[in-house]
Amino acid sequence: MSFSFNFGNSKPEKHMINYKQIFENNKKWIAEKKNTDANFFEKLNKDQHPDYLYIGCSDSRVTAEDLMGAEPGEIFVHRNVANMVISIDLNVMSVINYAVRHLKVKHIVVCGHYNCGGVKAAMTPKDMGILNPWLRNIRDVYRLHKEELNAITDEHARYNRLVELNVKEQCINVIKTAAVQERYLKESLPTVHGWVFDISNGKLIDLEIDFNKELKGIREIYNLMGTEE
């Protein structure tokens, strides 16, 4: 099956930030924070105790703190192309281990977004060079859900559904990790959530993944703790 996508030719006007302006903006940000809380940076400098690990896409339009309304120190963030959790990616695996075992986060969120360029690229029959091994993981998601996706006749709707299914599969990959299984067995934490951000209206959508159900199903095969269900 071939795919072609047309999201319109109109492009929003870009406000390109001037390099020097960045440092002026930083000064304003510091002043605003101090005006709100004189001890803001003193408290921020002590340590971090985030309750959330956020695994999201590198897309410049999707920033965790903004869409969640969070402050610095509240979210531990990892971002890559198409919010992937790949077992041989030492970067994301190190982040998960640190967040779960050291920071003791209570929630792990995998957040995708509609109109994701990484997912779109994976659905395009084209050699992407160095990106091929990375995008193959998204194509694997399509293969796992081929019947459902092929039954969707509208290409844009099919594309959005793949975004959602990719989030679900990455949540499953999080649950497969030893760090998550070990701590959950001891403390019933962390809980894994799957979200999608709709760029067109700014809404966060909870895919309402049944964590306990997924964990039980996964541990039938991926049980790393040597315990019986």
Q: Where in the sequence are the language-model features?
A:
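Short beta-strand segments
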Residues: 55-57, 79, 109-113, 193-198
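A glycine-rich, hydrophobic loop/mini-helix early in the fold
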Residues: 63-91
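Short acidic/polar active-site loop segments enriched in Thr and Asp
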Residues: 106
